[in-house]
Amino acid sequence: MSLFELLEPTIAGMGYELVDIEQSAPGRLLRVFIDKKEGSITLDDCVAISNHLSQLLAVENIDYNRLEVSSPGLDRPLKKKADFVRYMGESARIRLRIALQGQRNFVGTLVEVNDDVLTLNADGKLLQIELRNLEKARLIPKL
């Protein structure tokens, strides 16, 4: 079982979404990024998750020196199909594993997701991108 698979149900059970996990060298820093459907992540949210995860990680004998829990930020990563559905109509920066039309990097508006294919409006062109071809995707914050 991966660390993501271990933490996701626990965090979901507390009413939050596990967005991403970052680990530095084994046993060092563990960063957990959380979000919730309504409102913003607060310091109290991070403290509650941190306290709960500290106990879970101890029980599961997961070695780490420091645990950081935070929001994913305004430029939130998009990882799952549900992320793309949730942020439909928003602007995103996309990097592909394999080039599409000779290009790997795109900026555009998320139009729709059907059958694991994302439609992105990039400069007026509708691109069909398979979700499995995504290397990295992040929201572009509205400032």
UniProtKB/Swiss-Prot annotation:
Keywords on record: Cytoplasm, Ribosome biogenesis
Matching InterPro entries, A to Z? Ribosome_maturation_RimP, RimP_C, RimP_C_sf, RimP_N, RimP_N_sf
Any Pfam family the entry gives: RimP_N
**In its keyword annotation, does this UniProt entry include Cytoplasm?**
yes
Record's GO cellular component terms: cytosol
Q: Where in the cell is it found?
A: Cytoplasm
**Listed CDD domains:** YlxS_C
Q: Which GO terms describe its biological process?
A: ribosomal small subunit assembly; translation
Q: Is Translocase a UniProt keyword of this protein?
A: no
Q: Which domain of life is it from?
A: Bacteria
HAMAP family this protein is in? RimP (MF_01077)
Q: Which family does it belong to?
A: Belongs to the RimP family.
Q: What does this protein do?
A: Required for maturation of 30S ribosomal subunits.
Question: PANTHER family this protein is in?
Answer: RIBOSOME MATURATION FACTOR RIMP (PTHR33867:SF1)
Q: What is this protein called?
A: Ribosome maturation factor RimP
